[in-house]
Amino acid sequence: MIAFIVLLSLAAVLQQSSGTVDFASESSNKKDYRKEIVDKHNALRRSVKPTARNMLQMEWNSHAAQNAKRWADRCTFAHSPPHTRTVGQLRCGENIFMSSQPFAWSGVVQAWYDEVKKFVYGIGAKPPGSVIGHYTQVVWYKSHLLGCASAKCSSTKYLYVCQYCPAGNIRGSIATPYKSGPTCGDCPSACVNGLCTNPCKYEDAFTNCNELAKETKCKTEWIKSKCPATCFCHTEII
């Protein structure tokens, strides 16, 4: 059976399906499938080539899942407004998948990851212009909070949404979604099954916080408020 599958943003393909699944049984509201989604992401994250020295372990986040569900239920094949994709102070990224028939969540996540076929670490999309953003979000080292949801939009349309916090796909860094090196090289004392478990709870407001922190030694309240990750997270993954 041929299933029409679309992955936001620009990819549209016809793909042979291995068979339909019961949509209700694949609901992301069920605890077993939440575990399936998280485990699939973590399995893919620990299998990246080249290996990653700073890849964080993902965990389920109910707030991100609620945000994903609200958007999935609107059955709009477009990204949700960025201001609706937040968990606390964290801004979240988003992957979207649409199919003409229900898919197992592991298959949805694998479809996003498979964009790796057109990705070269350190270079980016190859050939240039290829869609790789779903893959890079799945393996973005810093994204460690995950929430997903799905919706049956009609008899021929199923929408799957995952949100990732903090957001990946930072401009200028797409070609290096993680730091290559020995597995868990940046978290030797906080490594579980090849993934780091020590995320920094803060997020810097600026990309040049390292330079600012060196200049001020984090002694001003302004620097502490704008560069809290750099100032306070010395052993955690930033």
Curated annotation (Swiss-Prot):
Domain spans labelled ShKT: 200-233
Pfam families assigned to the protein according to its UniProt record, in alphabetical order: CAP, Crisp
Signal peptide: 1-19
Keywords assigned by UniProt, alphabetized: Calcium channel impairing toxin, Disulfide bond, Ion channel impairing toxin, Neurotoxin, Secreted, Signal, Toxin
Protein name per UniProt: Cysteine-rich venom protein
GO molecular function, one term: calcium channel regulator activity
Subcellular location: Secreted
SMART domains the record matches: SCP
Keyword Signal set for record: yes
Domain SCP: 38-164
Annotated S-S bridges: C75-C153, C92-C165, C148-C162, C184-C191, C187-C196, C200-C233, C209-C227, C218-C231
Stretches of the chain forming a coiled coil according to its record: none
Annotated Gene3D superfamilies: CAP (3.40.33.10), Crisp domain (1.10.10.740)
Record family assignment: Belongs to the CRISP family.
Protein role: Blocks olfactory (CNGA2) and retinal (CNGA1) CNG channel currents. Does not affect neither depolarization- nor caffeine-induced contraction of smooth muscle.
GO cellular component, one term: extracellular region
